[in-house]
Amino acid sequence: GLFSKFAGKGIKNLIFKGVKHIGKEVGMDVIRTGIDVAGCKIKGEC
């Protein structure tokens, strides 16, 4: 029915937002790690 359609959409949106947020957090960690590694390679401290 209409309600289940709406609920499904809401749940999908929540999951999508959650995944986007987690992706952003993980992405930031990866970027930070990458910057750290690049920095120590440049300085020769790895």
Curated annotation (Swiss-Prot):
Localization in the cell: Secreted
GO CC terms: extracellular region
GO biological process terms on file: defense response to Gram-negative bacterium; defense response to Gram-positive bacterium; killing of cells of another organism
Keywords from the UniProt entry: Antibiotic, Antimicrobial, Secreted
Pfam families from the UniProt entry: Antimicrobial_2
Tissue: Expressed by the skin glands.
Entry-linked InterPro entries: Antimicrobial_frog_2
Signal peptide: none
Function: Antimicrobial peptide active against the Gram-positive bacterium S.aureus (MIC=12.5 uM) and against the Gram-negative bacterium E.coli (MIC=6 uM). Has no antifungal activity against C.albicans. Shows hemolytic activity against human erythrocytes only at high concentrations (LC(50)=210 uM).
Family recorded in the similarity comment: Belongs to the frog skin active peptide (FSAP) family. Esculentin subfamily.
Protein name: Esculentin-1GRa
